[in-house]
Amino acid sequence: MYGISLIGTGESIRPAKAKEPEVKDLKEAYKTIEADHFAPRMEISFINGDKRDTLSYEKVTWNIGGEEKGLRYGENPGQEAALYKLVNGNLVLGEVEMLGSNQPLASIPELLQSGKHPGKTNVTDADNALNILRYLTDKPCAVIVKHNNPCGVATGSTLAEAYFRVNKADRLAAFGGCIALNRDCDMETAKLIVENYAEVVVAPDFAPGVMDVFATKKNLRVFRIKNMARLTDFVAKHVIDFKSLIDGGIVAQTSFSANARKPEDLIPAYCNRKITDKATGAVTYEEHKIKRLPTAKEYEDLVFGWLVEAGVTSNSVLYVKDGATVGIGTGEQDRVGVAEIARDKAYTKHADWISWEKYQKPYNDLRLAFGEEDGAKKQAEIMEQTRAEKGGLPGCAMVSDAFFPFRDGAEVGIREGITSIVQPGGAIRDWDVIDCCNDAGVAMVFTGQRSFRH
């Protein structure tokens, strides 16, 4: 049985004295840099009898204004925080080899422009963007993350096109987000980025002149992570994922890695339905299998969507089309509800984009910009177009991080015109969902792997 010892070396950890800010002080609280008391080094040891495997860490700081500083604060002002990089330790648990200390990514980002001092959420948002981008290296790709979930993910023939498409996917949520790019940021992409408000930009490197463009945004944090050029090295590697409990306990697990990364990894949906004769108790099995296989284009979107799913909080359902997210539903407790939320978000974002293209105004601002009567008329016209186009959902692939227990979840997407579904499979009523798809002419594939994320 493994035991875990957590050893801080150097200065001991002393919690800061709690202070209740007055309302007038709240704005200042967001500007305050917490002086953390975390030790400069940390070790975590896995002990099994006489065997001890130790992971060694060092605290990360940046030179900001001539001073060495760590994280601004944790998730909220008043929470001390520290970022540690792994400097030593090659751990093997069973047959699973953990990622070694010579391949850092988000734990040692090079801060090229500090803007506002980086905080914990800036680093974790960048990390989850990399968690998605590690699977999507074949084409230029952009991810925008906020609150540890993607606002959008999109590929393109160029990096600028990928950024344009990801911003279009959810222009509203992208405001103040963390933008991560899987190619060196060029001038065209940089000029598009500064047209909007972003908190963080992360890329392998930046072309000459790009930092001058970013300098016009004084609060923008710009991180260079050179190892992003080797993102494929991180696809099948694992790390130890620690979760602290409220009583100080720790849950340790190996990190998730998506197994279905290409079309041939996806399984055409099938199952054997168990039927028990009520009179005799005799058991027979009835085969159910999907009638239509995905097209080549659908396979591309199914794989893309499943890999994006690895970075979305559960329960989640996504709609994707042509290598871009259309609607993302996150963090819900029922699968039908999250499918509906993703659908509703697709409609909302579609309407907002129509408004932006026509009037250079957000949909919600049309009444302010054009007056109550004219603005309401414009909104009604946009909503009529959005409904006619079903929020851009026809032809989408529907992605679910866990199986559909009943057909009702799949039916949410089918009513909007989705043409393919990817999900883990394994529900007792898989047969019902398969029949539902066959009735609608929808292709469905299984991954054989759940993709929960909490």
Which residue ranges define each predicted feature?
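Amphipathic, non-transmembrane alpha-helical secondary structure
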Residues: 187-191, 343, 407-415
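C-terminal binding/interaction regions
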Residues: 196-231, 254, 392-454
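Active-site loops and adjacent core secondary-structure elements that bind or stabilize anionic groups
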Residues: 1-212, 216-280, 285, 298-307, ...
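Thiamine diphosphate
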Residues: 128, 338, 410
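Active-site/ligand-binding-proximal alpha/beta "capping" segment
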Residues: 293-295
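Glycine- and Gly-Pro-enriched alpha-helical subdomains that act as flexible
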Residues: 151-171, 318, 326-406
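Conserved helix-loop functional segments at active or binding sites
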Residues: 311, 348-352, 415
